[in-house]
């Protein structure tokens, strides 16, 4: 049994689901906050210093994968447990490459959620039993080799790209990221140049393929 009440941050854009997680987790842990997008997750993690973040992948403004990577860059000790509907093996491997300690499918029942939380907080890794560990480990190694290709875009460019793929206009993106529309346009130009994209449609396809947004 854990000797103290670890601090947990919940990140999920479905309010009812997030509140359900809060009520469940509060029976054993201290839930320090609930946020609904990746930007809020990064900001809250830096402010609240949780021991663990329970995070979904598909979130607006900034997806869970990129948010997790940003948090791990400044808080390497924080534990990340992805809780998502997506059972795509490549996505599971990518989550672990970005710093996850656990990956749990939302198809689990409420009682099953507590075991992976405890395991990850103890320093162990956890994966939903229905996922193939050998295949995930293979893809993790493969994804590590492809890391340089993934880094064609800067952190800021990935943020701009996700918002573009979500259908946001330049002014909206500028307001969200606190930059001028001219700076947004410059980032878009550099993104298209780096990816060899010639249209917004190609940018959206790239964002979907790289799990920044849902299809």
Language model segments and positions:
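Two-component/phosphorelay signaling modules centered on CheY-like receiver
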Residues: 15-33
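Receiver (REC) domain active-site loop signature in two-component systems and cognate sites
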Residues: 59
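Short, flexible helix-to-coil linker/hinge segments that flank and couple to helix-turn-helix
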Residues: 90-97, 101-159, 212-214
């Amino acid at each position: 049994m854990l000797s103290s009440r670890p601090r947990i941050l919940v990140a999920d854009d479905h309010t009812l689901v997030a509140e359900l997680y809060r009520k469940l987790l509060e029976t054993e842990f201290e839930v320090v906050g609930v946020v609904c997008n990746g930007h809020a997750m990064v900001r809250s993690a830096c402010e609240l210093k949780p021991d663990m973040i329970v995070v979904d992948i598909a979130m607006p403004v900034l997806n869970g994968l990129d948010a997790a990577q940003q948090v791990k860059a400044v808080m390497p000790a924080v534990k990340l447990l992805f809780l998502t509907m997506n059972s795509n093996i490549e996505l599971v491997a990518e989550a672990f490459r970005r710093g996850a300690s656990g990956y749990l499918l939302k198809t689990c029942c409420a009682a099953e959620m507590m075991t992976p939380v405890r395991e990850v907080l103890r320093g162990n890794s956890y994966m939903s039993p229905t996922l193939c560990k050998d295949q995930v480990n293979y893809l993790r190694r493969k994804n590590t080799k492809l890391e340089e290709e993934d880094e064609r875009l800067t952190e800021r460019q990935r943020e701009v790209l996700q918002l573009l793929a979500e259908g946001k206009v330049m002014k909206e993106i500028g307001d969200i990221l606190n930059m001028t529309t001219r700076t947004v346009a410059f980032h878009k130009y550099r993104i298209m140049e780096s990816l060899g994209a010639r249209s917004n449609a190609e940018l959206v396809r790239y964002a979907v393929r790289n799990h920044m947004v849902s299809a």
